[in-house]
């Protein structure tokens, strides 16, 4: 964590200690000054149920208790049923055992990510001609339908869920958040990529080699991307900004390089990371998105898929990778595993009105219904702090940028160490100045002055 710059006026405001107390004060400060503390650990999971299929979430610590100032939960859209009480949640003995997968799989496949953000198909009608050929062994769920998500996955009732409402004025400006680094996102036309209607979203499977860094030692590789949208006249982004919902939202899901498989990373702090960007209406067609939207007719039915040429994945995201909000949350669909690092870009992506209509009015979901309004209601922060890489509001048209308070992302221990460090520096300078003065006085005191003797000579 980058320390705050010390004030240049602070030494002038602290008087130098008296000569007799200098050594005592210096020794006292040496005993008090601690080693610079490490940054407080990120929030642990609230219960062993929060790990989804992994079932290995860390328990909620006392430091994770929510504050009194939680963001209000908005009225649920057709993406979430009311959460059951604690008595409705199954115990640990109800969780299914995780069956290890074959070690013969050499590389990550989409099957390794059965329910990350856009999971596999729910129960499909028997007359669906485009049933998934690879099968679907996951629990069935849908937006706005039974069963309630916490019964599908108990982690969906966790305390640190996503999406959330972002309030720029309450975001903590954190200079340590550096511009994101993307490598290998410009894909050649071949090999082609799989574009699929999984009944919950349109999902593009990404090949190996797409790397992303959130900072030193925080490297990830991209697995897939998908979209969330609304309906005609009804916006459908998952995250909101001060209650404002955008027409659509793109998610690019990444796996930490510290894990070989997705099921190992589920529920682990920082195991998964998602890049999110808001989509809104603009005057011109977006050529990058048109490469995908023009193929939606081919996958209109649930479970159908097609092959599309490789494209520049970074062109689907905003051009400014330096301005974003970041917080720790969860997957926004079952299993709702927590520990996911969310990076929500400040800049939006423009699509034409026709393209947004194509996105929301082409695909079909479960039960021969339109695949629309596939977003989850915003969840309470429960004491979490959203960090910002910039000290400004959201640059989204037609919404004007708004100033935010420069809240510090430093922990209390960091600030305490900084204060003691400044006091130590000031005392050291005062001690050196005092020693120098005493040295000068001692040197002058050793000189004896004798009056000049005038020898009288005879005339």
Curated annotation (Swiss-Prot):
Entry PTM: Asn-346 bears high-mannose type glycan structures.
Regulation affecting activity: Inhibited by coumarins, saccharin, sulfonamide derivatives such as acetazolamide (AZA) and Foscarnet (phosphonoformate trisodium salt).
Entry keywords, A to Z: Cell membrane, Cell projection, Disulfide bond, Glycoprotein, Lyase, Membrane, Metal-binding, Nucleus, Phosphoprotein, Signal, Transmembrane, Transmembrane helix, Zinc
Membrane topology, Cytoplasmic segments: 436-459
Primary site of residence: nucleus
Catalytic activity: hydrogencarbonate + H(+) = CO2 + H2O
Induction notes from the record: By hypoxia.
Activity at various pH: Optimum pH is 6.5.
Positions of Zn(2+) binding: 226, 228, 251
Record EC number: 4.2.1.1
Protein's name in the database: Carbonic anhydrase 9
Species of the source: Homo sapiens (Human)
């Amino acid at each position: 964590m980058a320390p705050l710059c010390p004030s240049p006026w602070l030494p002038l405001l602290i008087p130098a200690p008296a000569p007799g107390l200098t050594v005592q004060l210096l020794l006292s400060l040496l005993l008090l000054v601690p080693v610079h503390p490490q940054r407080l650990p990120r929030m642990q999971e609230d219960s062993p149920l929060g790990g989804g299929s992994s079932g290995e979430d860390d328990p909620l610590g006392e430091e994770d208790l929510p504050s009194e100032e939680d963001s209000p939960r908005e009225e649920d859209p057709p993406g979430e049923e009311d959460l059951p009480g604690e008595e409705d949640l199954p115990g640990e003995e109800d969780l299914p055992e995780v069956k290890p997968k074959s070690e013969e799989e050499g590389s990550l496949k989409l099957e390794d990510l059965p329910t990350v953000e856009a999971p596999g198909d729910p129960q499909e009608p028997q007359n669906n001609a485009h049933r998934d050929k690879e099968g679907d062994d996951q629990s069935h769920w849908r937006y706005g339908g039974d069963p309630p998500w916490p019964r599908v996955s108990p982690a969906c009732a966790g305390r640190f869920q996503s999406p959330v409402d972002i309030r720029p004025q309450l975001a903590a400006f954190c200079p340590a958040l550096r511009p994101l680094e993307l490598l290998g996102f410009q894909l050649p036309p071949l090999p082609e990529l799989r574009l699929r209607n999984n009944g919950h979203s349109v999902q593009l499977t990404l090949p190996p080699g797409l790397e992303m860094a959130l900072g030193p030692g925080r490297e990830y590789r991209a697995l897939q991307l998908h979209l969330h949208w609304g309906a005609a006249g009804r916006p459908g982004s998952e995250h909101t900004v001060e209650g404002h919902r955008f027409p659509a939202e793109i998610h690019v899901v990444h796996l930490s390089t510290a894990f070989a498989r997705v099921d190992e990373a589920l529920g682990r702090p920082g195991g998964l990371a998602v890049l999110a960007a808001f989509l809104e209406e603009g005057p011109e067609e977006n050529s990058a998105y048109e490469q995908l939207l023009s193929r939606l007719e081919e996958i209109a039915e649930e479970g159908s898929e097609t092959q599309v040429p490789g494209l520049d994945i970074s062109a689907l995201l905003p051009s400014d990778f330096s301005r974003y909000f970041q917080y720790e949350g969860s997957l926004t669909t079952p299993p709702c595993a927590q520990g996911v690092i969310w990076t929500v870009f400040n800049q939006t992506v423009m699509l034409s009105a026709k393209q947004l209509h194509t996105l929301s009015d082409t695909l079909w979901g479960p039960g021969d219904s339109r695949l629309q309004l596939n977003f989850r209601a915003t969840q309470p922060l429960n004491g979490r702090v959203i960090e910002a890489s910039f000290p400004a509001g959201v640059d989204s048209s037609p919404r004007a940028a708004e100033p935010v308070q420069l809240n510090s992302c430093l922990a209390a221990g960091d600030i305490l160490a900084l204060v003691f460090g400044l006091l130590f520096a000031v005392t050291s300078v005062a001690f050196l100045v005092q020693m120098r003065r005493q040295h000068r006085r001692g040197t002058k005191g050793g000189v004896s002055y004798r009056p000049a003797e005038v020898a009288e000579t005879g005339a």
